[in-house]
């Protein structure tokens, strides 16, 4: 890997940026044809550490060995898109048609648990809570330094992650990326126009309409957004106004661990498989935004699962959707109804 | 299938619409795990017509049989996202947070050739020219009636099309979809600011820079956009200002058939496979836009191939990309260099 930072370029036709991570081209590729998500068959911890580069003591493709961790474990991504080197692999350009800027930051992997056979859905509430605390700690540590800290998880080969060890990622950057920038602007505009926080306003109306709400507890509501794109796309919202993850109280975090585990069990039960998904947190930006007014932001957790009809048939983002407009077949209301009615006990327990 | 039109909904967080095609949920699913693209092994025309629902005389999943066509063949999609029924499956809503509109239109399939074993890359120039004339005829026929006529092709199981019979699609709608709308606005803005057509201005600068131009003839230039996202994303541009496909002259269409075939051969040669791609035309909108000034538009043909390292390893759009910002690993300049240097003779001819 070259010792230079990557850069991003601007697409003036559709007003989006794209990161050009020339650093990463030589990284080993572990993925993944589209295949049924499976958990690794029962094996001892010793076998695991040989087989799985994310397990305690496991050796990663970079040759670095993991600590013998017993709870969560955070390490720097061996092939990061964001780095903090002195130089950049590309020069800044500022023309309207040729716009390119250096990107800096850090990319980490967050292992949720030492046991490769567990998932957030099959870990117990106490273990999920530990993951939530790790997320909080990362936001506290990286927020002051970076404009945007993206915590996310790709689960399953069908979304490009073939290692089923329970883990997510964190990418923190010295700039506000395309999508959070859009969310920043739209929430700001909504507040200026209506004097209300967009997603609070939205949650209030959904609470009355009822038809897209799947599950709620005292502090959180899980729903299918009216505008959902992915077949079983959902959003988890705090019931009160919360700008950032780090604004959550202890009780809210405890409550989050409960509803997060419950909703992931429901997901697994849809097709009786370890449901593949992309999951990501969004809240008010950090870094220089910490001293700005971001009160129009509402924290939310998005789930984008690609499966539509079975454990092996993913939704393709193709053709008309990449040239003109996205499309979904299943209505958001039917998706909400399916998820509402599905069992709250994990299917694997019933098979025993 | 219900006899009701579909609708689209607005996502106020990221300013995008999504089509909710509740009509389509019951369509038969022919796709596709990620697999190496293959052509059907040699078989007689009779066998083909039994095996392949897109071949002459073939029976489609709807039970409808194709004509015994000998050149190109256009038919209405049996499970269309756009229809022209009397009623809509959803009521119009116009709230800022709950915005939903009926969509109307037509979806067609365009078979390029009766022979299931050919592709645009392996057809001869005369046969490619016939496809171009069919595209032109469709634009002429549907343009006056619809605001946007999207001609596109998904090629290969990896982009969701498992039927290798040479074919593309056309979706025409009574509204301007999300991405063409963005292109409309950005090109307009560029013209207002610079007094130049954005993509003409861009082509002029790329012609001087040279490093992303792959191939050109008298009327067309094939290049990797500075802001390309897909690993081998490219764009084909007319050398002069052309607003719409139907503005192309006879000589330009002849020239297009030549360069289109040549560039697709290069694509196939990258990994010595029938290269999967999404291909789509964009030009000034039609319908009510035909009487408006759209002179800031430049016609272009985009190619979004998902392969990165081999015939079986696709790029995933996942994780960070769906929550924050798109990323590519290969630089646009290296992609351009690879495509420039690759052979112009189809690999299948060399294997013989
Ligand atoms: Zn992973
Ligand atoms: Zn197809």
Swiss-Prot record, chains A, B:
Enzyme class, top EC level, equals: transferase
Pathway note: Carbohydrate metabolism; galactose metabolism
Q: Which GO terms describe its molecular function?
A: UDP-glucose:hexose-1-phosphate uridylyltransferase activity; zinc ion binding
Q: Which GO terms describe its cellular component?
A: cytoplasm
Q: Mind telling me which InterPro entries this protein's record contains? A: GalP_UDPtransf1 (IPR001937), GalP_UDPtransf1_His-AS (IPR019779), GalP_Utransf_C (IPR005850), GalP_Utransf_N (IPR005849), HIT-like_sf (IPR036265)
Per its Swiss-Prot or TrEMBL entry, what cofactor is needed? Zn(2+)
Q: For this entry, list what GO says about its biological process.
A: galactose catabolic process via UDP-galactose, Leloir pathway
Cofactor binding note: Binds 1 zinc ion per subunit.
Q: Which residues does the annotated region (Disordered) include?
A: 33-57
Catalytic positions are 167 (tele-ump-histidine intermediate)
Quaternary state and interactors: Homodimer.
Output the NCBIfam families linked to this UniProt entry.
Answer: galT_1 (TIGR00209)
Q: Which family does it belong to?
A: Belongs to the galactose-1-phosphate uridylyltransferase type 1 family.
Name recorded for this polypeptide: Probable galactose-1-phosphate uridylyltransferase
Species of provenance: Caenorhabditis elegans
Q: What is the taxonomic lineage of the source species?
A: Eukaryota, Metazoa, Ecdysozoa, Nematoda, Chromadorea
């Amino acid at each position: 890997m070259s010792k230079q930072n990557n850069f991003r370029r601007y697409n003036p036709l559709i007003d989006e940026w794209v990161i050009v991570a020339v650093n990463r081209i030589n990284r080993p590729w572990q993925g993944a044809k589209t295949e049924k998500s499976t958990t690794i068959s029962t094996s001892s911890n010793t076998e695991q550490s040989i087989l799985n580069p994310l397990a305690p003591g496991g050796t990663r493709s970079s040759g670095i060995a993991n600590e013998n961790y017993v709870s969560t474990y955070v390490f720097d991504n061996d092939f990061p898109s964001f780095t903090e080197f002195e130089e950049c692999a590309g020069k800044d350009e500022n023309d309207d048609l040729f716009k390119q800027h250096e990107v800096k930051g850090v990319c980490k992997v967050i292992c949720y648990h030492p046991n490769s056979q567990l998932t957030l859905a099959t870990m117990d509430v106490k273990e999920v809570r530990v993951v939530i605390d790790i997320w909080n700690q990362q936001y506290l540590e990286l927020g002051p330094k970076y404009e945007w800290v993206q915590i996310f998880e790709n689960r399953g080969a069908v979304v490009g992650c073939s290692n089923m060890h329970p883990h997510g990622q964190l990418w923190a950057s010295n700039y506000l990326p395309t999508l959070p920038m859009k969310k920043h602007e739209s929430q700001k505009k909504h507040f200026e126009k209506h004097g209300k926080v967009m997603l609070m306003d939205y949650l209030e109306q959904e609470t009355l309409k009822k038809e897209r709400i799947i599950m709620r507890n005292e502090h959180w509501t899980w729903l299918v957004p009216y505008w959902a794109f992915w077949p079983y796309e959902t959003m988890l919202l705090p019931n009160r106004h919360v700008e950032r993850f780090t604004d959550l109280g202890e009780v809210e975090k405890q409550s989050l661990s409960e509803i997060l585990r419950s909703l992931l069990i429901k997901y697994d039960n849809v097709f009786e498989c370890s449901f593949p998904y992309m999951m990501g947190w969004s809240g008010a930006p950090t870094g220089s935004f910490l001293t700005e007014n971001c009160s129009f932001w509402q924290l939310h957790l998005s789930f984008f699962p690609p499966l539509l009809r079975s454990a092996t048939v993913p939704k393709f983002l193709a053709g008309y959707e990449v040239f003109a407009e996205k499309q979904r077949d299943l209505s958001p209301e039917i998706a909400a109804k399916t998820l509402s009615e599905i069992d709250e006990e994990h299917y694997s327990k019933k098979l025993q």
